Amino acid sequence: MAKHIVELTDALSNKIAAGEVVERPASVVKELVENAIDAGSTVIDILVEEAGLNKITIIDNGSGIEEEDVATAFLRHATSKIKNEADLFRVHTLGFRGEALPSIASVSHLSMETSTGETKGTTISLEGGKIMEQKSGHARKGTQIEVSQLFFNTPARLKYLKSLPTELGNITDILNRLALAHPDISFRFSHNGKPLLQTNGNGDLRQVIAAIYGVSIARKSIPVKAESLDFNISGYAVLPEVNRSNRNYISTIINGRFIKNFALVKAIQEGYHTLLPIGRFPIIVLQIEMDPIIVDVNVHPAKLEVRLSKEKELGQLISQMIKEAFHQLQLIPDGEVSKKQKEQQKSEQIQMSFEENKLPKETPTLFSKPNVPEYVPSDEDTSREDDFILETLPTYDSKIQPEQAEEPKERIPKMYPIGQMHATYIFAQNENGLYIIDQHAAQERIKYEFYREKIGEVSRELQELLVPIVLEFPTDEYVRLEEQKTKLEEVGVFLENFGQNSFIIRAHPTWFPKNQEEEMLREIIDEALSAPSISIHKLREDTAIMMSCKKSIKANHYLTMQDMEALLDTLREASDPFTCPHGRPVIIQYSTYELEKMFKRVM
């Protein structure tokens, strides 16, 4: 017998909605803080006990709620943020579904005090979504919400929560992102009475970066900016020498909303291309403003994922912006490696939330900077801390002046070789100090830029083979190469069908290494076969990297003084001479001052 279809009760519907909206304590914090932001708050206090499982309290100084609207706020899909269908396509607020408050209330004990500041305040208490008490009373302007006994009526949900440190890390991560997205709001977050995050809300994004990641990271950041007809991008990109083992430090913010978008992350990585070692990722914060009509935030209840109608154009703008910003800088890292950096490279399993909540000790930087003592904020001294950070962070101007554009500054200075160490590293000097150059990485960069340019012009420089090369392949690879023939021709591999599962090659680019033509051709074909589908841009890039790596001088190769001098002079002509195509550093510098300090000649 078929079962009857019945309408679910509001209580059950709210619990189902809570399963999507309220996954863990961090979800509660996110929804309530976003409501506070939408209410126009300038100061938001977040007080958490036992990673939110015991109690979560959010206090803001926003617009508050009228007394007659307080009970309505806990009804499903009741909201003040949109009125009609047209508003759904021009969402200017972080919340708009009207699901957060009823969903949170349905799985917790919740109390709220709110006032618009014009009339008496209102207090309301709910348990499991049911209103237990509502009364008028005195309250300051704004809203205070306290959530306790989370998931008391859905014990199965508690089984899926992680350890307290993990849940606290999730909360901290969300608050870090919200603080980065809204530097004009003061966030004050504490756990069990201990302050974990404090920002002053003065609108300076770099100060927020310092508060979250530490002053040393903020010092290593440069401003980036770009705009088009559709997009306005600003933010800070941290120098490539400071990187991480995961993508957690990439923050993309659209219209004040932190979002996750794979295409934009790929665009950021493309902007850092060849500047980062393989498997390493940048630290960057981008704030992107656009017309709400071209971004759809109504994709998922958590609103972390969005759809962009001009995603490709935005990605290209981001990549180009980052490349241009770093192209103006001299990216030679200091020779000294701090203990903290060593420990970071050994183990990076610490969540971004906990990494640098205290201001770290001074570490060597690429730029000159004032000496800054270690400083740990006290509970009473947050305003002084913010002033301290502001005063000690240098300002970088990433804009090129017209006169600078006419006479571009050398990317690396003239260096005079003085010897070779272990037949691998070149030692050079000038008036600025000592330079150590990885000879393989240096020539790899030079050859990479040469091949990258040549691979785009293969049709003009072809050499006929006296003896054509015949290559045989398994059926599956033969079929795939048939599909890739056009792309392969653009990188210098011209395949003609030659019998069953075979191709013949009659010519190759003139810049192929002599006596290694067949090896080179097979390497390029292997690159094309290594991925199910590959773009011509990626194939060219991978081919240039592969050829430069294989054809560069290796370690344990002795060079004459003339060879070293020629290599360094050629390196100075490279467009990006600071890293090899794999992102490893080419040059490390010890300034004269650092050397004199090591030998105690200066104090």
UniProtKB/Swiss-Prot annotation:
HAMAP family assigned: DNA_mis_repair
UniProt GO MF annotations: ATP binding; ATP hydrolysis activity; ATP-dependent DNA damage sensor activity; mismatched DNA binding
Keywords attached to this Swiss-Prot or TrEMBL record, sorted alphabetically, are: DNA damage, DNA repair
- What organism does the record attribute this protein to? Listeria welshimeri serovar 6b (strain ATCC 35897 / DSM 20650 / CCUG 15529 / CIP 8149 / NCTC 11857 / SLCC 5334 / V8)
Specify the signal sequence span: none
Does the keyword field hold Secreted? no
Q: Where is the composition biased (Basic and acidic residues)?
A: 336-346
GO cellular component terms attached to this protein's record: mismatch repair complex
Q: Where is this region: Disordered?
A: 336-355, 361-384
Protein's job: This protein is involved in the repair of mismatches in DNA. It is required for dam-dependent methyl-directed DNA mismatch repair. May act as a 'molecular matchmaker', a protein that promotes the formation of a stable complex between two or more DNA-binding proteins in an ATP-dependent manner without itself being part of a final effector complex.
- Family according to the record: Belongs to the DNA mismatch repair MutL/HexB family.
Task: Spell out the InterPro entries in the cross-references.
Answer: DNA_mismatch_repair_CS, DNA_mismatch_repair_MutL, DNA_mismatch_S5_2-like, HATPase_C_sf, MutL/Mlh/PMS, MutL/Mlh/Pms-like, MutL_C, MutL_C_dimsub
Gene Ontology biological process terms from the UniProt entry? mismatch repair
Name it. DNA mismatch repair protein MutL
